[in-house]
Amino acid sequence: MDRPAYRRVVVKLSGEYLAGSQPFGIDQPTIDRIAGDLAEARALGVEIAVVVGGGNIFRGVEVSSRGVSRPTGDTMGMLATVMNCLALEAALERRGQSARALSSFVMPEVCELFTRRAAHKYLAEDRIVLLAGGTGNPYFTTDTTAVLRAAEIGAQAVLKATNVDGVYSSDPKKDPSAKRFERLSHSQALEGGYKVMDATAFALARETALPIIVFSIAEPGSIGAILKGTGRGTIVAS
Protein backbone atom coordinates (compact mmCIF):
# COMPACT_ATOMS: atom_id res chain seq x y z
CA MET A 1 0.00 0.00 0.00
CA ASP A 2 1.29 3.46 -0.88
CA ARG A 3 1.87 5.60 2.17
CA PRO A 4 -0.64 8.49 2.41
CA ALA A 5 0.79 11.93 1.73
CA TYR A 6 -1.12 13.51 4.63
CA ARG A 7 -2.02 12.60 8.20
CA ARG A 8 -5.13 14.79 8.50
CA VAL A 9 -7.19 16.46 5.76
CA VAL A 10 -10.42 18.32 5.18
CA VAL A 11 -12.43 17.16 2.16
CA LYS A 12 -14.71 19.78 0.60
CA LEU A 13 -17.76 18.36 -1.21
CA SER A 14 -20.26 20.43 -3.16
CA GLY A 15 -23.89 20.03 -2.24
CA GLU A 16 -24.82 20.03 -5.92
CA TYR A 17 -22.81 16.85 -6.45
CA LEU A 18 -24.95 15.02 -3.88
CA ALA A 19 -28.00 15.57 -6.11
CA GLY A 20 -26.54 13.23 -8.73
CA SER A 21 -28.50 13.59 -11.96
CA GLN A 22 -31.44 15.17 -10.13
CA PRO A 23 -32.01 18.95 -10.23
CA PHE A 24 -32.04 19.07 -6.43
CA GLY A 25 -32.18 16.90 -3.33
CA ILE A 26 -30.00 13.94 -2.31
CA ASP A 27 -29.36 11.07 -4.70
CA GLN A 28 -28.94 7.97 -2.54
CA PRO A 29 -26.60 6.01 -4.85
CA THR A 30 -24.36 9.08 -5.13
CA ILE A 31 -24.12 9.71 -1.39
CA ASP A 32 -23.59 6.00 -0.74
CA ARG A 33 -20.73 5.92 -3.24
CA ILE A 34 -19.11 9.00 -1.68
CA ALA A 35 -19.50 7.44 1.77
CA GLY A 36 -17.70 4.38 0.47
CA ASP A 37 -14.87 6.49 -0.93
CA LEU A 38 -14.50 8.34 2.37
CA ALA A 39 -14.50 5.11 4.38
CA GLU A 40 -11.83 3.60 2.10
CA ALA A 41 -9.73 6.75 2.44
CA ARG A 42 -10.06 6.63 6.23
CA ALA A 43 -8.86 3.03 6.16
CA LEU A 44 -5.54 4.33 4.81
CA GLY A 45 -4.91 5.80 8.26
CA VAL A 46 -5.72 9.40 7.37
CA GLU A 47 -7.88 11.46 9.73
CA ILE A 48 -10.69 12.99 7.67
CA ALA A 49 -13.06 15.90 8.24
CA VAL A 50 -15.62 16.82 5.61
CA VAL A 51 -17.28 20.13 4.73
CA VAL A 52 -20.38 19.80 2.55
CA GLY A 53 -22.15 22.60 0.71
CA GLY A 54 -25.92 22.99 0.65
CA GLY A 55 -26.60 23.97 -2.95
CA ASN A 56 -28.54 20.80 -3.71
CA ILE A 57 -31.16 21.93 -1.19
CA PHE A 58 -30.94 25.72 -0.96
CA ARG A 59 -28.76 28.56 -2.22
CA GLY A 60 -28.89 31.73 -0.15
CA VAL A 61 -27.41 33.93 -2.88
CA GLU A 62 -30.25 33.12 -5.28
CA VAL A 63 -33.08 34.15 -2.95
CA SER A 64 -31.56 37.54 -2.15
CA SER A 65 -33.21 38.83 -5.33
CA ARG A 66 -36.62 37.59 -4.18
CA GLY A 67 -37.08 39.79 -1.16
CA VAL A 68 -35.12 37.66 1.32
CA SER A 69 -32.13 39.44 2.85
CA ARG A 70 -28.70 38.02 2.10
CA PRO A 71 -27.97 37.20 5.78
CA THR A 72 -31.27 35.33 6.09
CA GLY A 73 -30.74 33.52 2.81
CA ASP A 74 -27.21 32.52 3.77
CA THR A 75 -28.44 31.21 7.11
CA MET A 76 -31.03 29.08 5.30
CA GLY A 77 -28.25 27.74 3.09
CA MET A 78 -26.10 26.91 6.10
CA LEU A 79 -28.98 24.94 7.59
CA ALA A 80 -29.15 22.97 4.33
CA THR A 81 -25.56 21.86 4.94
CA VAL A 82 -26.69 20.37 8.25
CA MET A 83 -29.19 18.17 6.39
CA ASN A 84 -26.49 17.04 3.97
CA CYS A 85 -24.10 16.22 6.81
CA LEU A 86 -26.73 14.17 8.61
CA ALA A 87 -27.45 12.24 5.40
CA LEU A 88 -23.75 11.58 4.87
CA GLU A 89 -23.32 10.60 8.52
CA ALA A 90 -26.08 8.01 8.11
CA ALA A 91 -24.53 6.70 4.88
CA LEU A 92 -21.14 6.30 6.56
CA GLU A 93 -22.62 4.56 9.59
CA ARG A 94 -24.44 2.10 7.31
CA ARG A 95 -21.06 1.12 5.90
CA GLY A 96 -19.66 0.55 9.38
CA GLN A 97 -17.59 3.74 9.37
CA SER A 98 -18.15 5.73 12.55
CA ALA A 99 -18.88 9.41 11.89
CA ARG A 100 -19.88 12.50 13.84
CA ALA A 101 -21.58 15.68 12.62
CA LEU A 102 -20.54 18.92 14.31
CA SER A 103 -22.45 22.14 13.64
CA SER A 104 -21.54 25.82 13.74
CA PHE A 105 -25.00 26.40 15.23
CA VAL A 106 -26.24 25.38 18.65
CA MET A 107 -28.79 22.63 17.98
CA PRO A 108 -28.26 19.95 20.63
CA GLU A 109 -31.24 17.86 19.54
CA VAL A 110 -29.71 17.53 16.06
CA CYS A 111 -25.93 17.51 16.36
CA GLU A 112 -23.13 18.64 18.61
CA LEU A 113 -21.67 22.15 18.46
CA PHE A 114 -18.34 22.40 16.64
CA THR A 115 -15.32 23.04 18.84
CA ARG A 116 -11.70 22.31 18.07
CA ARG A 117 -11.55 20.03 21.10
CA ALA A 118 -14.54 17.98 19.92
CA ALA A 119 -13.15 17.69 16.40
CA HIS A 120 -9.76 16.52 17.69
CA LYS A 121 -11.44 14.00 20.01
CA TYR A 122 -13.56 12.38 17.31
CA LEU A 123 -10.76 12.33 14.75
CA ALA A 124 -8.54 10.56 17.29
CA GLU A 125 -11.34 8.00 17.75
CA ASP A 126 -11.14 7.09 14.05
CA ARG A 127 -14.40 8.83 13.23
CA ILE A 128 -14.96 10.87 10.11
CA VAL A 129 -16.00 14.33 11.29
CA LEU A 130 -18.68 16.13 9.27
CA LEU A 131 -18.54 19.90 9.63
CA ALA A 132 -22.01 21.38 9.19
CA GLY A 133 -23.40 24.90 9.24
CA GLY A 134 -20.69 26.67 7.27
CA THR A 135 -18.78 29.24 9.30
CA GLY A 136 -21.98 30.14 11.14
CA ASN A 137 -21.85 33.60 9.57
CA PRO A 138 -23.40 34.98 6.37
CA TYR A 139 -21.36 36.07 3.35
CA PHE A 140 -18.85 33.22 3.74
CA THR A 141 -18.89 30.21 1.43
CA THR A 142 -18.40 26.59 2.37
CA ASP A 143 -15.09 26.74 0.45
CA THR A 144 -13.92 29.33 2.97
CA THR A 145 -15.36 27.14 5.74
CA ALA A 146 -13.22 24.23 4.57
CA VAL A 147 -10.02 26.27 4.71
CA LEU A 148 -10.96 27.87 8.04
CA ARG A 149 -11.77 24.55 9.70
CA ALA A 150 -8.64 22.95 8.24
CA ALA A 151 -6.52 25.68 9.80
CA GLU A 152 -8.38 25.35 13.11
CA ILE A 153 -7.98 21.59 13.45
CA GLY A 154 -4.43 21.42 12.12
CA ALA A 155 -5.20 19.65 8.85
CA GLN A 156 -2.33 19.38 6.40
CA ALA A 157 -4.38 19.97 3.25
CA VAL A 158 -7.82 20.73 1.85
CA LEU A 159 -9.04 18.30 -0.81
CA LYS A 160 -11.47 20.20 -3.03
CA ALA A 161 -13.65 17.64 -4.82
CA THR A 162 -15.13 18.93 -8.09
CA ASN A 163 -16.43 17.62 -11.41
CA VAL A 164 -13.14 18.42 -13.21
CA ASP A 165 -9.68 16.98 -12.61
CA GLY A 166 -7.95 20.17 -11.54
CA VAL A 167 -7.66 23.88 -12.22
CA TYR A 168 -7.80 24.92 -15.87
CA SER A 169 -6.94 28.17 -17.63
CA SER A 170 -10.57 28.30 -18.81
CA ASP A 171 -13.63 26.07 -18.69
CA PRO A 172 -12.49 22.79 -20.31
CA LYS A 173 -16.10 21.90 -21.14
CA LYS A 174 -16.36 25.01 -23.31
CA ASP A 175 -12.77 25.52 -24.43
CA PRO A 176 -10.97 22.43 -25.82
CA SER A 177 -7.67 24.34 -25.71
CA ALA A 178 -7.93 24.97 -21.95
CA LYS A 179 -4.70 24.18 -20.11
CA ARG A 180 -4.71 22.13 -16.92
CA PHE A 181 -2.26 23.27 -14.28
CA GLU A 182 -0.27 20.71 -12.30
CA ARG A 183 0.61 23.27 -9.66
CA LEU A 184 -0.19 26.90 -8.80
CA SER A 185 0.77 29.17 -5.95
CA HIS A 186 -2.00 30.68 -3.87
CA SER A 187 -1.14 34.07 -5.36
CA GLN A 188 -1.37 32.71 -8.90
CA ALA A 189 -4.76 31.21 -8.13
CA LEU A 190 -5.97 34.55 -6.79
CA GLU A 191 -4.54 36.59 -9.64
CA GLY A 192 -5.86 34.17 -12.26
CA GLY A 193 -9.40 34.51 -10.96
CA TYR A 194 -10.03 30.78 -11.35
CA LYS A 195 -13.57 29.96 -10.28
CA VAL A 196 -12.83 26.61 -8.67
CA MET A 197 -12.78 28.31 -5.23
CA ASP A 198 -13.63 31.81 -4.08
CA ALA A 199 -10.98 34.44 -3.44
CA THR A 200 -11.51 34.49 0.33
CA ALA A 201 -10.75 30.77 0.54
CA PHE A 202 -7.57 31.12 -1.51
CA ALA A 203 -6.46 34.17 0.50
CA LEU A 204 -6.96 32.38 3.82
CA ALA A 205 -5.13 29.33 2.52
CA ARG A 206 -2.22 31.55 1.50
CA GLU A 207 -2.17 33.22 4.92
CA THR A 208 -2.14 29.88 6.72
CA ALA A 209 0.20 28.17 4.18
CA LEU A 210 -2.41 25.47 3.62
CA PRO A 211 -2.22 23.40 0.42
CA ILE A 212 -5.40 22.90 -1.61
CA ILE A 213 -5.69 19.95 -3.98
CA VAL A 214 -8.38 20.30 -6.65
CA PHE A 215 -9.49 16.99 -8.16
CA SER A 216 -12.46 15.22 -9.71
CA ILE A 217 -14.60 13.04 -7.49
CA ALA A 218 -16.39 11.48 -10.46
CA GLU A 219 -14.27 8.32 -10.40
CA PRO A 220 -14.72 5.93 -7.46
CA GLY A 221 -11.65 5.81 -5.24
CA SER A 222 -10.45 9.27 -6.24
CA ILE A 223 -10.11 10.53 -2.65
CA GLY A 224 -7.86 7.64 -1.71
CA ALA A 225 -5.83 8.09 -4.90
CA ILE A 226 -5.18 11.74 -4.06
CA LEU A 227 -4.11 10.80 -0.54
CA LYS A 228 -1.68 8.19 -1.88
CA GLY A 229 -0.25 10.64 -4.38
CA THR A 230 -1.44 8.67 -7.40
CA GLY A 231 -4.50 10.77 -8.24
CA ARG A 232 -4.80 13.47 -10.89
CA GLY A 233 -5.37 17.04 -9.76
CA THR A 234 -3.92 20.50 -9.28
CA ILE A 235 -1.95 21.41 -6.17
CA VAL A 236 -2.36 25.00 -5.00
CA ALA A 237 0.37 25.72 -2.48
CA SER A 238 2.94 28.31 -1.45
From Swiss-Prot:
<feature type="binding site">
    <location>
        <position position="162"/>
    </location>
    <ligand>
        <name>ATP</name>
    </ligand>
</feature>
<protein>
    <recommendedName>
        <fullName>Uridylate kinase</fullName>
        <ecNumber>2.7.4.22</ecNumber>
    </recommendedName>
</protein>
<keyword id="KW-0665">Pyrimidine biosynthesis</keyword>
<feature type="binding site">
    <location>
        <position position="54"/>
    </location>
    <ligand>
        <name>UMP</name>
    </ligand>
</feature>
<keyword id="KW-0418">Kinase</keyword>
<feature type="binding site">
    <location>
        <position position="55"/>
    </location>
    <ligand>
        <name>ATP</name>
    </ligand>
</feature>
<comment type="subunit">
    <text>Homohexamer.</text>
</comment>
<dbReference type="GO" id="GO:0005829">
    <property type="term" value="C:cytosol"/>
</dbReference>
<feature type="binding site">
    <location>
        <position position="74"/>
    </location>
    <ligand>
        <name>UMP</name>
    </ligand>
</feature>
<feature type="binding site">
    <location>
        <position position="171"/>
    </location>
    <ligand>
        <name>ATP</name>
    </ligand>
</feature>
<comment type="pathway">
    <text>Pyrimidine metabolism; CTP biosynthesis via de novo pathway; UDP from UMP (UMPK route): step 1/1.</text>
</comment>
<keyword id="KW-0547">Nucleotide-binding</keyword>
<dbReference type="GO" id="GO:0006225">
    <property type="term" value="P:UDP biosynthetic process"/>
</dbReference>
<dbReference type="Pfam" id="PF00696">
    <property type="entry name" value="AA_kinase"/>
</dbReference>
<keyword id="KW-0963">Cytoplasm</keyword>
<dbReference type="GO" id="GO:0033862">
    <property type="term" value="F:UMP kinase activity"/>
</dbReference>
<comment type="similarity">
    <text>Belongs to the UMP kinase family.</text>
</comment>
<feature type="binding site">
    <location>
        <begin position="135"/>
        <end position="142"/>
    </location>
    <ligand>
        <name>UMP</name>
    </ligand>
</feature>
<feature type="binding site">
    <location>
        <position position="163"/>
    </location>
    <ligand>
        <name>ATP</name>
    </ligand>
</feature>
<dbReference type="InterPro" id="IPR001048">
    <property type="entry name" value="Asp/Glu/Uridylate_kinase"/>
</dbReference>
<dbReference type="GO" id="GO:0044210">
    <property type="term" value="P:'de novo' CTP biosynthetic process"/>
</dbReference>
<feature type="binding site">
    <location>
        <position position="59"/>
    </location>
    <ligand>
        <name>ATP</name>
    </ligand>
</feature>
<feature type="binding site">
    <location>
        <begin position="12"/>
        <end position="15"/>
    </location>
    <ligand>
        <name>ATP</name>
    </ligand>
</feature>
<feature type="binding site">
    <location>
        <position position="168"/>
    </location>
    <ligand>
        <name>ATP</name>
    </ligand>
</feature>
<keyword id="KW-0067">ATP-binding</keyword>
<dbReference type="InterPro" id="IPR036393">
    <property type="entry name" value="AceGlu_kinase-like_sf"/>
</dbReference>
<dbReference type="GO" id="GO:0005524">
    <property type="term" value="F:ATP binding"/>
</dbReference>
<comment type="function">
    <text>Catalyzes the reversible phosphorylation of UMP to UDP.</text>
</comment>
<dbReference type="InterPro" id="IPR015963">
    <property type="entry name" value="Uridylate_kinase_bac"/>
</dbReference>
<dbReference type="InterPro" id="IPR011817">
    <property type="entry name" value="Uridylate_kinase"/>
</dbReference>
<keyword id="KW-0808">Transferase</keyword>
